[in-house]
Amino acid sequence: MVYKARISLSGTENKIVDVVCEEIKGIAKRTGVEIHGPIPLPTKRLVVPVRKSPDGEGSPTWDRWEMRVHKRLIDVDADERTLRQLMRISIPDGVRIEIQIKS
């Protein structure tokens, strides 16, 4: 039976997210299933301004810390063999993966 799997990847390092996308594309190519993506979604930018001086004295100077979250979306028409191989991918730290399966 052929399933439709929607794989969403997110992480703070875009190169690592792209490496995982290439692994998924390689599995899809080897098993001969149809793949759509990776579709780059908008990057979320989280900014936290922090006061440099801990005691509140002196001029108000601020540090701005920033974290960017990169997202990719991949749609795969997958059979059971492909899904098993997708589950066995080693995912590096800092990458979050979600798989939604529709029959």
From Swiss-Prot:
InterPro entries, A to Z: Ribosomal_uS10 (IPR001848), Ribosomal_uS10_CS (IPR018268), Ribosomal_uS10_dom (IPR027486), Ribosomal_uS10_dom_sf (IPR036838), Ribosomal_uS10_euk/arc (IPR005729)
A matching Pfam family: Ribosomal_S10
Swiss-Prot/TrEMBL keywords: Ribonucleoprotein, Ribosomal protein
GO molecular function: structural constituent of ribosome; tRNA binding
GO biological process, alphabetically ordered: translation
Top-level taxon of origin: Archaea
Keyword field contains Ribonucleoprotein: yes
Keyword Cell division in annotation: no
GO cellular component: small ribosomal subunit
PROSITE patterns: RIBOSOMAL_S10
PANTHER family cross-referenced by the UniProt entry: 30S RIBOSOMAL PROTEIN S10 FAMILY MEMBER
Main function: Involved in the binding of tRNA to the ribosomes.
Oligomer status and interactors: Part of the 30S ribosomal subunit.
Membership in a protein family: Belongs to the universal ribosomal protein uS10 family.
Name this protein carries in UniProt: Small ribosomal subunit protein uS10
Organism from which the protein derives: Picrophilus torridus (strain ATCC 700027 / DSM 9790 / JCM 10055 / NBRC 100828 / KAW 2/3)
